[in-house]
């Protein structure tokens, strides 16, 4: 049986609970090649200036949208070509979600990190198929799970022969259309040995809160992210966009890219103090 790696390397980016945090960042949905390149380019400029490593993220298919008519993305085939070009152009690793076992091999042939969505985190066949790609696996904790329940989820991947796993906290259901972030979950998740990621933007989501779409409270992203890095995490997950209010999905949660650098600089200061004390 494999134990999870306490240090996970994605290209030249290191995720460890004991070292300065790294970043998973990008728009919620892949909208077009031009938009993906614009976002990746701006993110690279910002992260180069402040000295933090990043993995570029985006979703080719938002398979769990609130309503049938909601925009879902550009699809797997187009997205893989764009991800491949982003890796070459900007020299950054990339991450995207998988929703079925059949998608794992195709996505794993291009993408560096396969992400298991929160709603699917207990789907054994999906976890095993993702594990067998040999890629790094980032598992979102289901909103319906206690943090200690994630140990068995983690073992499904490691016992399939893949120790390259990260666990991601993204909030817990707290009544209807509400999530709450319990920071006690972070040390609990850390105790399983894998790097822990905090998803600061989905944690402020209001699932289905706008009737036919999800709402959110982006004004609390920084509050929760500060708390998470103060506890100590391996990485911060942030979705960003140049115009969140007009984004095709998760706009109410996303950080405007014009505000990204200041936010990251603040988080890096909190992270430094946290890791120095610990």
Curated annotation (Swiss-Prot):
Annotated GO CC locations: cytoplasm
GO annotation (BP), single: keto-3-deoxy-D-manno-octulosonic acid biosynthetic process
EC number: 2.5.1.55
Main location: cytoplasm
Localization annotation: Cytoplasm
Transmembrane segments: none
Domain of life: Bacteria
Keywords: Cytoplasm, Lipopolysaccharide biosynthesis, Transferase
Keyword Cytoplasm: yes
GO MF, one example: 3-deoxy-8-phosphooctulonate synthase activity
Keyword Glycoprotein assigned: no
Pathway: Carbohydrate biosynthesis; 3-deoxy-D-manno-octulosonate biosynthesis; 3-deoxy-D-manno-octulosonate from D-ribulose 5-phosphate: step 2/3; Bacterial outer membrane biogenesis; lipopolysaccharide biosynthesis
Catalytic activity: D-arabinose 5-phosphate + phosphoenolpyruvate + H2O = 3-deoxy-alpha-D-manno-2-octulosonate-8-phosphate + phosphate
Family: Belongs to the KdsA family.
Designated name of the protein: 2-dehydro-3-deoxyphosphooctonate aldolase
